[in-house]
Curated annotation (Swiss-Prot):
Residues 1-19, 78-92, 173-185 are periplasmic. NCBIfam families: PRK10782.1. This is D-methionine transport system permease protein MetI. It comes from Salmonella typhimurium (strain LT2 / SGSC1412 / ATCC 700720). It holds the Pfam family BPD_transp_1.
Length: 217
């Protein structure tokens, strides 16, 4: 493997990490409040609102059901409006964020559902407001589950970013497709696969350690 290809792979790793973590961050900025809203508006919860819950849940389910490669192509016009181009690192972050947000929202809701109902009832009995319950009870108690959700999301985004590489998003996916598949270079393809596996392993390892650190003893 040439030195130029090695540097290209290094840049591909950096671009993949950038796409993964930046879109993961923005996905959580959108998905976390949506997930909390899904939870608190569920039947029997602190801000029960059946109409809002059904509407929000339907939107989340619709976007979750769209395969990422189709979402990527469908969002090309919107991506051009937002970042001015439909290819490259910045362009990839837009559909990655949109793909991640509903996934995160549902996992946040599920993490909150694991909290014992007695804690919430005790807080309500002491006169806590819904906002106080969310800030001081729900989010702290669900922190291990939220960290686990973040880990799963980042791993999913690594795979999404690789798919995006096939349509010019950059990163390891584009290198594997352009130089490995199109260029019939098995060495490059295998190297890309190994690098993706290593990235996923490191993200999972880091996530597991953080979960252990924040889990109540």
């Amino acid at each position: 493997m040439s030195e130029a290809m090695m540097w290209l792979l290094v840049r591909g790793v950096w671009e993949t990490l950038a796409m993964t973590f930046v879109s993961g961050f923005f996905g959580f900025v959108i998905g976390l409040p949506v997930g909390v809203l899904l939870y608190v508006t569920r039947p029997g919860q602190i801000m029960e609102n059946a109409r809002l819950y059904r509407s929000l849940s339907a939107v989340v389910n619709i976007f979750r059901s769209i395969p990422f490669i189709i979402l990527l192509v469908w969002m090309i016009p919107f991506t051009r409006i937002i970042v001015g181009t439909s290819i490259g690192l910045q362009a990839a972050i837009v559909p990655l964020t949109v793909g991640a947000a509903p996934f995160i929202a549902r996992m946040v809701e599920n993490a909150l559902l694991e909290i014992p109902a007695g804690l919430i009832e005790a807080s309500r009995a002491m006169g806590a407001t819904p906002l106080q319950i969310v800030r001081k009870i729900l989010l702290p108690e669900a922190l291990p589950g939220l960290v686990n959700a973040a880990t799963i999301t980042l791993i999913t985004l690594v795979g999404y970013s690789a798919m995006g590489g096939a349509v010019g998003a950059g990163g390891l996916g584009q290198i594997g497709y352009q130089y490995g598949y199109i260029g019939y270079n098995a060495t490059v393809m295998n190297t890309v696969l190994v690098l993706l596996v290593v990235l996923v392993y490191l993200i999972q390892l880091s996530g597991d350690r953080i979960v252990r650190a924040v889990t109540h003893k």
